[in-house]
């Protein structure tokens, strides 16, 4: 819900090409993978020691697993991690665990909102907000 509301609002600012996050040098192209890190550095973060763009993915992955609610396979599919087992990789489809992933992403958005008010661990938040029950 939260992401759709934000993206819908941002879409009104999109140019003719329909991109919401346009590149700084060419508005016809999307932002690069380095844009988030540059923004963090502008805000005063050391992207080699404190936080980096990829670190947000690692944080989300760890928190989702720590909550104990979601299967590792669903988390891995959501993060688009590559399967290390070659045989298994041949049978994995990107569309796996779609319903669980939908619930997981809504739980993640709600978890982030809850942490605006007061810091709470993923494990503790899962006790009071379990969409699987």
Identify the role of each PLM range:
Residues 8-28, 33-77, 81-84:
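Short, basic (Lys/Arg/His-rich) helix/loop patches that form interaction surfaces
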Residues 2-5, 13-17, 22-28, 83-86, ...:
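C-terminal secondary-structure termini that scaffold catalytic or DNA-interacting sites
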């Amino acid at each position: 819900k939260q992401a759709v509301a934000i993206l819908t609002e941002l879409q009104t600012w999109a140019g003719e090409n329909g991109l919401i996050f346009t590149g700084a040098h060419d508005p016809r192209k999307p932002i690069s993978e380095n844009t988030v890190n540059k923004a963090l550095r502008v805000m005063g973060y050391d992207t080699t020691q404190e936080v980096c763009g990829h670190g947000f993915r690692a944080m989300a992955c760890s928190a989702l697993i720590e909550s104990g609610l979601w299967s590792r396979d669903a988390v891995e599919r959501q993060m688009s991690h590559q399967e290390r087992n070659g045989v298994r990789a041949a049978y994995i489809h990107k569309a796996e665990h779609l319903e669980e992933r939908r619930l997981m992403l809504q739980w993640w958005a709600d978890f982030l909102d809850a942490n605006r008010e007061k810091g709470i661990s993923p494990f503790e938040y899962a006790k009071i907000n379990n969409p699987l029950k």
